[in-house]
C-alpha cells in the first residue's frame, strides 16, 4: 500500500467535514482539461452526499480495509521484481509535478477514493 495509506490507517480516529474545494485553483491546475474536470464535478461532486459523521463512525472499518492491502514494502518489492520504475527520478518527473499531481488527481475522475475522502478530513500536516 502507498505510504500515504499506511499513515492514514494509523489514525485511530478522524474529524471529518464537508469537502471544501477551491475550484478556481483546481481548474487552473488542469489547464486545457479544466472543462472536462468541471463536467465531472458539476452540478454536484462525488462527495456531496457523504455525511462527514458517517466517515467518522465508519473509520474503524475503513482502517481495517486499508490494512488489508499489501504493505508499501511488499508492493515496492513486487514492482521491482517486475522491472517497474519505482522512483520519481526513474519515471523522469519533476518532484514538484508529482506533489501537485498527488494533491489534485482525485478531481479528474468521478470516483470516490480514499484520497478524495481524505480531503474531507482534518489531517496532521506531516501526513503528506
Segments predicted by a language model, with ranges:
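C-terminal charged capping/lid subdomain of soluble metabolic enzymes
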Residues: 3-128
